[in-house]
Amino acid sequence: MNATIFALLLLLNLAMYNAAEQSSETDMDDTLLIPENYRKGCFKEGHSCPKTAPCCRPLVCKGPSPNTKKCTRP
């Protein structure tokens, strides 16, 4: 009985592995590419830039003092 259960689990594992492998094959046309310049969590030009989140590329965090830094072009 233990051998039967083991064999069934092995077959189920192989079936799930094959299904997962086939579903992971995607075309680049089907995927949505997000530009790195506007990734989630970055600040746009003119926004104050605390240490918690970076400025969107190619912007840099500049300012005369740490409290007045803003995202600006380099």
From Swiss-Prot:
GO molecular function: ion channel regulator activity; toxin activity
Tissue specificity field: Expressed by the venom gland.
Disulfide bonding pattern of the chain: C42-C56, C49-C61, C55-C71
Residues of the propeptide: 20-39
Signal peptide bounds: 1-19
GO cellular component terms given for this protein: extracellular region
Compartment(s) where it occurs, according to its Swiss-Prot or TrEMBL record: Secreted
Primary residence: secreted
Keyword Membrane part of the UniProt annotation: no
Keywords tagged on the record: Disulfide bond, Ion channel impairing toxin, Knottin, Secreted, Signal, Toxin
Record note on domains: The presence of a 'disulfide through disulfide knot' structurally defines this protein as a knottin.
Family of the protein in this entry: Belongs to the neurotoxin 36 family. 01 subfamily.
Function: Probable ion channel inhibitor.
Protein name listed in UniProt: U5-theraphotoxin-Cg1a
Organism: Chilobrachys guangxiensis (Chinese earth tiger tarantula)
